[in-house]
């Protein structure tokens, strides 16, 4: 007899060791509370202190993975869970590893003809050859400089003068060996959740500062979010189709959230994928899901159920 989900022992993986540990602890607590109140046998498991490889021996049947960032969202945890044979929520090994790398994600989208920002790539190895004026000639000013791998907008700089480019690149290289210099996308910013292959309503993000950084994302109360986003039905539809293509190209499953921006000509450009979106009280995925009738608890249960398919 196969157990029902309610009979299974469920590990909520939270915390971890990445730069986004605190956010994951918040998300994990919210997810845990939702599962408990829905009648599931759920337990908090922090890989920082608990050996995840022993989950099966400890009687766990399934994982709700709400780790954010490296070690939890980059394919390593997914690979470990595949090895020990425990089903888990969200994307698999390949997609998790790929989407953690902004550069390679964008290159794949570009190869499939999907729109992304123009960019230059700098590595620790070739930073000595960086020619700021040539970069600015190609991309214009301002530009956005960011580490390829770190999540939660750590290490970002908006560069407005060619003289400031080198120091911004050096700053980003503290967080990663590969840095992207991208053309500045001056239009509105959107984030679009996908749940079980259904694209949910987009959310428009209006940060208080010039871009959506760690402060705006997690600390500031002045970042504004609009859902519905204010796009015309036609443009919302265009955005939905683009996001679904982007989701499919990188091989997402279960749930993910895709960030998109408008450029100066009002054209959509894909930015990145979050394979384990935040699930705190003010997170964006639940905000959007609420507009189509999901309570937070229903959303959490749905994500868990998708891991069983």
Curated annotation (Swiss-Prot):
Binds 2 magnesium or manganese ions per subunit. Its main location: cytoplasm. GO terms for molecular function: ATP binding; D-alanine-D-alanine ligase activity; metal ion binding. Pfam families: Dala_Dala_lig_C (PF07478), Dala_Dala_lig_N (PF01820). One of its GO terms (biological process) is cell wall organization. HAMAP family: Dala_Dala_lig. This is D-alanine--D-alanine ligase. It comes from Pasteurella multocida (strain Pm70). The gene is ddl.
């Amino acid at each position: 007899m196969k157990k029902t989900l309610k009979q299974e022992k469920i590990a909520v993986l939270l915390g971890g060791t990445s730069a986004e540990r605190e956010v994951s602890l918040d998300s994990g607590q919210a997810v845990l509370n939702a599962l408990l109140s829905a009648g599931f046998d759920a337990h908090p498991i922090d890989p920082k202190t608990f050996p995840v490889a022993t989950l099966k021996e400890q009687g766990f049947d399934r994982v709700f993975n709400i780790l954010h960032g490296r070690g939890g969202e980059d394919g390593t945890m997914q690979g470990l869970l595949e090895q020990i044979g425990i089903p888990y929520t969200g994307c698999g090994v390949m997609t998790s590893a790929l989407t953690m790398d902004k550069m390679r994600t964008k290159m794949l989208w570009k190869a499939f003809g999907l729109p992304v920002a123009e960019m230059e790539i700098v590595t620790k190895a070739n930073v000595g050859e960086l020619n700021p004026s040539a970069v600015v000639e190609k991309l214009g000013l301002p530009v956005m400089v960011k580490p390829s791998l770190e999540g939660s907008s750590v290490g970002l700089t908006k560069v407005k003068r060619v003289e400031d480019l080198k120091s911004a690149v050096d700053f980003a290289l503290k967080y990663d060996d590969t840095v992207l210099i991208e053309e500045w996308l001056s239009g509105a910013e959107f984030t679009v959740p996908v749940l079980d292959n259904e694209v949910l309503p987009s959310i428009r993000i209006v940060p208080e500062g010039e871009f959506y950084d760690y402060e705006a994302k997690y600390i500031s109360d002045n970042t504004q979010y609009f859902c519905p986003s204010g796009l015309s039905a036609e443009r919302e539809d265009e955005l939905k189709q683009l996001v679904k293509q982007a989701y499919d190209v990188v091989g997402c499953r279960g749930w993910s959230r895709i960030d998109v921006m408008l450029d100066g000509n009002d054209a959509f450009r894909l930015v990145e994928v979050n394979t384990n979106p935040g699930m705190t009280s003010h997170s964006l995925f639940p905000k959007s899901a609420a507009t189509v009738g999901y309570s937070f608890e229903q959303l959490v249960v749905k994500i868990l159920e998708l891991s069983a398919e």
